[in-house]
């Protein structure tokens, strides 16, 4: 593995990543084209609201969504999506958060989503939670039973919850004139999800910018209904809403846009085949080793992300090397 002088100077040894696009090890690695675009963006001042608007328009063009917005990570995107459902584009309501007054402020969210920070983030903006189902399963009937006059939105964690169930939740929510927020942070690849999930009718869909998109790790991509995306913008920086502290710089905006452009132009099938071959090479190398158990999940058989193959190695006490 090549040394990295930036980390050497700090006394930190880089890792060999055999885990995936995990936040705690840095997400993904950006392509040279992305870092070059970010460096170029850093050389000029620019009207940030204008850049935010134009980048959003371009991302919407690329994905076919009504509108798009770059957040400071996917968790920030879910929080701002929640704020958008609480305030709409009402400037006074934006200024009052987390005081929601008499507005509907309850989010119906499943307990199968064990990302507690998502639950916390919706409370931070003044929301309350109707947590439904169990840590193992949730049904559309669970969602339906929780809807009341105080409901602001329904939240779906795609991956733990299936696309089929998402469609059912969307149908249920829209029958009650309620929006649906989809946490799809790790649901790329396939890149078709960028287009297909919003096209299902999900009102706000949030992807990580620093996982499979391979943009800046501190970015998220919010796609959805124009009015609600505009409400996300009002609640975020450089405006004076509850999300002011979740700043996205000009460099990150330009970097994520370039990363999305590269992702959409990439030969995804070839990339997935390459990943699968890497897994099979490892299987051939260690599969017969004593004490080593191999569990291979081919592409499109898992949930995080759906298209990625996974190889799990379990080391027993008689394995030649410790785990």
Predicted regions and their residues:
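Conserved C-terminal alpha-helix-loop-beta "cap" of PLP-dependent enzymes
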Residues: 6, 287-323
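Conserved PLP-enzyme active-site core in the AAT-like
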Residues: 2-25, 29, 56-70, 75-264, ...
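Charged, low-complexity, helix-prone segments enriched in Lys/Glu/Asp/Gln
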Residues: 41-42, 49-50, 86, 96, ...
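Residue-level signal for secondary-structure boundary elements
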Residues: 46-50, 93, 155, 240, ...
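Conserved PLP-dependent catalytic core of the aminotransferase class-I/II
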Residues: 62, 264-299
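Broad hydrophobic/π-residue packing in well-ordered secondary structure
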Residues: 45, 118, 321-323
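A glycine-/small-polar-enriched, mobile loop at the entrance of the PLP active site in fold-type I
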Residues: 16-54
């Amino acid at each position: 593995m090549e040394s990295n002088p930036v980390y050497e100077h700090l006394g930190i040894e880089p890792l060999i990543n055999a885990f995936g696009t995990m936040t705690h090890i840095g997400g993904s690695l950006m392509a040279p084209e992305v870092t070059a675009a970010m460096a170029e963006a850093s050389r000029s001042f620019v009207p940030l609201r204008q850049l935010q608007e134009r980048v959003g328009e371009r991302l919407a063009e690329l994905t076919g969504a009504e509108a798009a917005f770059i957040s400071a990570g996917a968790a920030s995107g879910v929080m701002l999506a929640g704020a958008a459902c609480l305030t709409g584009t009402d400037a006074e309501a934006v200024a009052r958060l987390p005081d929601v007054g008499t507005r509907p402020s309850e989010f119906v969210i499943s307990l199968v989503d064990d990302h507690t920070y998502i639950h916390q983030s919706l409370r931070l903006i003044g929301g309350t939670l109707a947590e439904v189902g169990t840590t193992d399963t949730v049904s559309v009937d669970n969602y339906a039973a929780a809807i009341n006059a105080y409901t602001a939105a329904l939240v779906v964690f795609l991956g733990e919850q299936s696309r089929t169930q998402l469609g059912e939740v969307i149908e249920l929510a829209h029958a009650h004139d309620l929006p649906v927020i989809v946490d799809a942070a790790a649901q790329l690849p396939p890149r078709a999800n960028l287009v297909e999930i919003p096209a299902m009718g999900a009102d706000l869909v949030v992807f990580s910018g620093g996982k499979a998109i391979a943009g800046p790790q501190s970015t998220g991509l919010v796609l959805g209904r124009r009015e609600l995306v505009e409400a996300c913008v009002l609640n975020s920086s450089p405006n004076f809403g509850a999300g002011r502290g979740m700043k996205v710089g000009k460099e990150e905006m330009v970097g994520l846009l370039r990363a999305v452009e590269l992702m959409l132009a990439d030969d995804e099938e070839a990339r997935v085949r390459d990943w699968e071959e890497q897994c099979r090479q490892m299987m051939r190398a260690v599969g017969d080793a004593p004490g080593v158990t191999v569990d291979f999940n081919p592409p499109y058989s898992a949930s995080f992300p759906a298209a990625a193959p996974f190889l799990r190695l379990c080391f027993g006490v008689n394995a030649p090397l410790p785990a």
